[in-house]
Amino acid sequence: MHSKVTIICIRFLFWFLLLCMLIGKSHTEDDIIIATKNGKVRGMNLTVFGGTVTAFLGIPYAQPPLGRLRFKKPQSLTKWSDIWNATKYANSCCQNIDQSFPGFHGSEMWNPNTDLSEDCLYLNVWIPAPKPKNATVLIWIYGGGFQTGTSSLHVYDGKFLARVERVIVVSMNYRVGALGFLALPGNPEAPGNMGLFDQQLALQWVQKNIAAFGGNPKSVTLFGESAGAASVSLHLLSPGSHSLFTRAILQSGSFNAPWAVTSLYEARNRTLNLAKLTGCSRENETEIIKCLRNKDPQEILLNEAFVVPYGTPLSVNFGPTVDGDFLTDMPDILLELGQFKKTQILVGVNKDEGTAFLVYGAPGFSKDNNSIITRKEFQEGLKIFFPGVSEFGKESILFHYTDWVDDQRPENYREALGDVVGDYNFICPALEFTKKFSEWGNNAFFYYFEHRSSKLPWPEWMGVMHGYEIEFVFGLPLERRDNYTKAEEILSRSIVKRWANFAKYGNPNETQNNSTSWPVFKSTEQKYLTLNTESTRIMTKLRAQQCRFWTSFFPKVLEMTGNIDEAEWEWKAGFHRWNNYMMDWKNQFNDYTSKKESCVGL
């Protein structure tokens, strides 16, 4: 009798446990399938640091911009009836691939890792498990000079952030190059800024859908690096974006950088040049676009590089422009007038922002040696990075950046050219943006990233390079299998915590007493925080001398001596010819009148 009772108990226990497992399994599966406004999506569970993160990869957020939709603003998506399988990254947008250093991880880690296609408007969502209620959302916008980039890179994996800080991470693909930014201003067939409108539509998707994933649409922080940071700053200016996010983080980029925004004249000129190069020159603008729409995307990509009369390693051949829609006026004017979203911002730069670009064409520079250059090579480098600047303008840069204490030491010229490129293109614009923004009473926090990753594949002389804070922001060093040092793990943990705190509360400071308190950046004191593996410090007025040169002195030099951009090249050549004709005519007229006077009285 006793054994029968035991068997019954065991059977009951077996079926009870089986039922619990089935209930648990179906519960997990229910959590993985989420109903969006357009239809259901299926994600997948990932094991991260002994816990779980649910990833939804490759969710469509717009109609594929194919055929007649090429060069147009993105169109809203229609509904689907089946369950969308969001378990792998989608296509990357069409772009040129960096083939400068074949097989070298340092450059190839930034190349797209999924198929290239015009059908590329997809986004990714990482959510902590169990599904949160009202979690803060961080939306990543990748860099790549508006010419390249994709959300599926390993370095942009949102699972660590989601797991460690219980935030929701979102990233989207947006169109780049001519397919994303070609513009005939005023023409609805190619209005320009399509890539920015892609981003904006993804932000709208988050507002409509993130609650279903456990996110809070009223707590959304944008963060991006390089052109991604410039994009974030443009969303601060664009009235159509203001209601779609709460706060902003800008890593190594801002809209006032010299590469970030293209003038209307130049944007139009480049479109016409592309039309010429692809055999699409027509009298009628709409016919030009019609012809370009019928071209293979590869043909457009191949000709993109040749639309400017001169190029630099930082050339943005097709980028944001003032279209009267996304951007209502020149960004500098909008900033000056205070016409931007009033909110908290976190901004920063890396110690050696310029070095990454030197190995892409500056004389004497190579990733395979110490790149010790001469004064002459420094001058040649200035010609490459400042092709439209007068000789006097280049001379003023040379004078300001020469170390006159030891002007014969070759290492000084190598470092000086890196500083020139970094200060002019990244550090000083970011500081100036933060100063202007904070003058309107907004809390701003500024960082200076000083740590060179132990895993950096580029040579030692390149220092703390552009783009190499990203892995610390996304928490990659927390994955011990990746063999970062213990100090790097601690640094990354601190950065992740500060970024998440800023996103949640508008203040990056940690609650623990042992961490350095990050002060608010004000235009007077300009306090900033250094980020490194040794001792975090509070400093003031980063690169004040150099930035005063770029913001105050250099523009005056250009004004007095002429800074010739591509639009002016043609105009000045035409004016020069006209001036010669006029002088010739005047000389002949003077000659005629003098002869006439000498004839009087004969």
From Swiss-Prot:
Carbohydrate-modified residues: N45, N85, N134, N269, N284, N369, N483, N509, N513, N514
Cellular compartments annotated: Secreted
Signal peptide coordinates: 1-28
Source species, domain of life: Eukaryota
EC category: hydrolase
UniProt main location, coarse: secreted
GO biological process terms on file: acetylcholine catabolic process; choline metabolic process; cocaine metabolic process; learning; negative regulation of cell population proliferation; negative regulation of synaptic transmission; neuroblast differentiation; peptide hormone processing
Protein name: Cholinesterase
Organism for this UniProt entry: Homo sapiens
Gene: BCHE
